[in-house]
């Protein structure tokens, strides 16, 4: 689906806050967001991991620090979450998602786009045998269980949320050509997509309401 199936609109420049900005998907969000003229704030534990750039504000903090998250969220127009566990440190991020949501409510920021994964919830049934019987249960179970908790927290909020479920993440250039799947009966086999195209989808949905309050699978 070219460009996610959207009518081309005039670019809207916004104030964006990115969590997970030092990961590969987060970096793709920073690169494309800045290239589009957005004012981007990266919330990171290690500011030295990012280079200073025009239009980029780097804030040091931990997602479990409610005061730091609240300061970062204040004044933003959308929050983009590309958070993922590091080094098998599970159990932390669902609490971080709760803190982000609370900060957004306090600041009056409505749009949250959160990166989850194929294999979470009803999307597991869409995947091929190898993914369902081998890859997910033996290699991804803990990570996807945590993502499912995060999705539940987001769904229970009154924010304008979109959950993004990419297939297997790859390096590669942005193509703008991928499938956006919301029908749980659609079979996808072994889904895959470049991180750059995940960022492309997210940035195309900063104000669009087509996928509002839905989990969207992304794959080629």
Walk through the language-model features, giving the residues of each.
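Mid/C-terminal beta-alpha module of Rossmann-like enzyme folds, strongest
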Residues: 5, 9-22, 109-112, 184-220
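N-terminal Rossmann NAD(P)H-binding glycine-rich loop of SDR-like oxidoreductase domains
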Residues: 16-36
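Conserved Rossmann-fold cofactor-binding substructure of NAD(P)-dependent oxidoreductases
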Residues: 57-76
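Glycine/proline-rich active-site loop of Rossmann-fold NAD(P)-dependent oxidoreductases
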Residues: 122, 173-178, 205-214
């Amino acid at each position: 689906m070219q460009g996610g199936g959207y009518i081309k609109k005039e670019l809207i420049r916004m104030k964006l806050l990115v969590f997970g900005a030092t990961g590969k998907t987060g970096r793709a969000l920073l690169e494309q967001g800045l290239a589009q003229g957005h004012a981007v704030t990266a919330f990171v534990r290690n500011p030295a991991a990012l280079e200073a750039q025009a239009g980029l504000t780097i804030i040091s903090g931990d997602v479990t620090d409610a005061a730091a998250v609240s300061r970062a969220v204040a004044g933003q127009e959308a929050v983009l979450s590309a958070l993922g566990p590091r080094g098998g440190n599970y159990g932390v991020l669902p609490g971080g998602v709760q803190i982000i949501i609370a900060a957004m409510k306090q600041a009056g920021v409505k749009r949250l786009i959160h990166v989850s994964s194929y294999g979470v919830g009803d999307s597991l049934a869409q995947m091929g045998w190898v993914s369902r019987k081998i890859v997910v249960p033996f290699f991804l179970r803990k990570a996807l269980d945590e993502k499912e908790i995060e999705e539940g927290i987001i769904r229970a909020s009154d924010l304008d949320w979109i959950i993004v479920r990419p297939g297997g993440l790859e390096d590669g250039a942005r193509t703008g050509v991928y499938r956006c799947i919301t029908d749980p009966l659609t079979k996808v086999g072994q889904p895959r997509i470049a991180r750059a195209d995940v960022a492309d989808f997210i940035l195309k949905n900063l104000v669009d309401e087509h996928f509002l309050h839905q989990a969207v699978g992304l794959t080629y």
